[in-house]
C-alpha cells in the first residue's frame, strides 16, 4: 500500500505546461440560453457542455488566425487575420456574413530588409554630419562589416583618424605626430618634457 517505488500519481496528473483550465462562465451561458423563448428548461449539464464547445471553437479559430498572422509576417493578430482565417477554413463558413465588412489585410510582405548594425550606422552619420562636434578619441581601429555577402569573404581593419577638436593639448599633438610618423618614443619622456614646460 505505502510502496514509495510505485508512484502512480505522477502518471495521472497532466503536465502543467501543456494543460490549463479555462472555462467560460456556466451561469452566464445558462442565462443566455434561457433568454431564448424557444428554449424551455435547460438541463444542468448543458451549459457545461456548451462552455467546453465554446472553448474548443475559440481555440480553433485563434490558432487559424495565428497561422494567417505568420503568413503575413505580422507581429499582432488583427481582425483582418481573423477574416482570412474564416475565409480559408470551411468549418467557419457560418461566419462569412459577419467578416465581410472587415477590411482586408495588406498583401503578404516580401523578405524584410536586413538592418545595418547601430555602430556602423552611427559612424556613417558622423561622417556625413559635420555640424556635430566630434568626440575626442584616440586612434583606434574599426572592423568594417561586409557590405554584400558575395563581394568579400573576410573583414578588414582600417585605422580611424579623428579631426582635432581644439580641446587637445600640445602633448596630444606631439603624441599623435610621433604615432603618425612611426616614431614610438617613450610616453614618459614626452610627458616629462610637457610637465617641465608647464611648471
From Swiss-Prot:
GO terms for biological process: DNA-templated DNA replication; transcription by RNA polymerase II. One of its GO terms (molecular function) is RNA polymerase II general transcription initiation factor activity. Residues 112-121 have a biased composition (Basic residues). InterPro entries: CBFA_NFYB_domain (IPR003958), Histone-fold (IPR009072), Transcr_DNA_Rep_Reg (IPR050568). Residues 185-199 have a biased composition (Polar residues). It holds the Pfam family CBFD_NFYB_HMF. Keywords: Nucleus, Transcription, Transcription regulation. The keyword Repressor does not apply. Its main location: nucleus. Residues 106-199 are annotated as: Disordered. It comes from the Eukaryota. It is found in: Nucleus. Disruption phenotype: Leads to only a few rounds of cell division before arresting with an elongated cell (cdc) phenotype. Belongs to the NC2 alpha/DRAP1 family. Transcription regulator complex subunit that is essential for cell cycle progression. This is Transcription regulator complex subunit bur6.
Amino acid at each position: 500500500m505505502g510502496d514509495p517505488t510505485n508512484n502512480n500519481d505522477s502518471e495521472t496528473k497532466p503536465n502543467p505546461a501543456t494543460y490549463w483550465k479555462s472555462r467560460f462562465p456556466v451561469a452566464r451561458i445558462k442565462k443566455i440560453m434561457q433568454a431564448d423563448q424557444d428554449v424551455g428548461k435547460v438541463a444542468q449539464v448543458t451549459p457545461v457542455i456548451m462552455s467546453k464547445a465554446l472553448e474548443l471553437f475559440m481555440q480553433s479559430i485563434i490558432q487559424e488566425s495565428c497561422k494567417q498572422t505568420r503568413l503575413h509576417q505580422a507581429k499582432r493578430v488583427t481582425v483582418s487575420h481573423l477574416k482570412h482565417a474564416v475565409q480559408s477554413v470551411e468549418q467557419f463558413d457560418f461566419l462569412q456574413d459577419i467578416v465581410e465588412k472587415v477590411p482586408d489585410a495588406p498583401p503578404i510582405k516580401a523578405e524584410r530588409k536586413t538592418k545595418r548594425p547601430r555602430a556602423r550606422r552611427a559612424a556613417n552619420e558622423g561622417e556625413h554630419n559635420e555640424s556635430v562636434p566630434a568626440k575626442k578619441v584616440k586612434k583606434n581601429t574599426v572592423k568594417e562589416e561586409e557590405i554584400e555577402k558575395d563581394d568579400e569573404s573576410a573583414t578588414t581593419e582600417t585605422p580611424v583618424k579623428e579631426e582635432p577638436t581644439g580641446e587637445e593639448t600640445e602633448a596630444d599633438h606631439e603624441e599623435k605626430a610621433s604615432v603618425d610618423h612611426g616614431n614610438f618614443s617613450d610616453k614618459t619622456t614626452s610627458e616629462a618634457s610637457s610637465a617641465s614646460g608647464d611648471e
